[in-house]
């Protein structure tokens, strides 16, 4: 009996390869779908192009990551509300049920001041979409620590209807992902699977290569009543070939399927085909 939880591939996991390569590698390895990180790659912003890729490779888009990164502050618009609205429209066009959202940066004063109310308005305009706020982490530089998010890096302190649990961010924050999941409670709607060592930076390691309780967290999802997707969000930018990138993505998928599988059942097989690039 296979787990009902889809395991999907974030387009950030194939960087620096483009968004289109995500669909190819997801199909090659056997992921259940894709999470599109909206950023400067034009394809990531284009519903028609993404629909074409999903159809060609037979891999649906199951979540959209709104352009919340430092490098995406001018994707679509410098206005963060416009960016979030466009991300919601993109998700609807693709049939993706979830939009991942970061808490506001400290310098986004107006956005931060009205974030809860504005989010409620966006939710009202897109009632079938889940806007899942992601846990972040404090930044440590030159022996100093600061939090670039308002009201903080832990969204459960403010309280939202839906959350994305990022395990690599838990490691960077030196917190336990099981405890974070407990704080999120029934609001846990989406997972970013990765790992980290707790060195104070965001590493996005292949699950099992750090010290987060990745296996335990995945095994706990069934008892938590989780009905969302698990998106692999790892860094493969330093690998030396497409083959090695695919190997990391395959290892990660096998890890996820193994620990999501109900007790006493076998995890679904992972595709062995490797396309060299």
Explain the meaning of each model-derived region.
Residues 70-74, 102-110, 135-143, 169, ...:
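Surface-exposed cleft-lining segments at the edges of enzyme active sites
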């Amino acid at each position: 009996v296979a787990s009902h939880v889809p395991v999907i591939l974030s387009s950030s996991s194939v960087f620096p390869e483009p968004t289109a390569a995500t669909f190819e590698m997801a199909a090659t390895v056997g992921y259940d779908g894709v999470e599109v990180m909206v950023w400067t790659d034009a394809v990531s912003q284009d519903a028609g192009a993404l629909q074409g890729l999903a159809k060609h490779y037979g891999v649906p888009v199951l979540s959209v990551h709104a352009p919340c990164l430092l490098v995406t502050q001018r994707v679509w618009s410098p206005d963060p509300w416009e960016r979030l609205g466009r991300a919601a429209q993109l998700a609807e066009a693709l049939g993706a049920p979830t939009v991942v959202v970061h808490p506001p940066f400290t310098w986004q004063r107006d956005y931060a001041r009205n974030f809860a109310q504005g989010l409620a308005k966006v939710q009202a305009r897109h009632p079938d979409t889940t806007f899942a706020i992601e846990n972040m982490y404090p930044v440590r530089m030159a022996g100093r620590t600061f939090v670039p998010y308002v009201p903080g890096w832990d969204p459960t302190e403010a309280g939202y209807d839906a959350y994305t649990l990022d395990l690599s961010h838990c490691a960077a924050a030196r917190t336990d992902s099981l405890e974070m999941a407990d704080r999120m409670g029934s609001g846990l709607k989406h997972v970013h699977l990765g790992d980290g060592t707790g060195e104070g930076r965001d590493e996005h390691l292949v699950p099992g290569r750090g010290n987060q309780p990745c296996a335990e967290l995945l095994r706990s999802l069934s008892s938590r009543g989780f009905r969302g997707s698990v998106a692999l969000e790892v860094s493969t930018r330093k690998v030396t070939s497409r083959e090695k990138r695919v190997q990391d993505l395959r290892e990660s998928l096998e890890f996820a399927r193994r620990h999501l599988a109900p007790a006493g059942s076998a995890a679904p097989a992972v595709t062995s085909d490797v396309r060299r690039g």
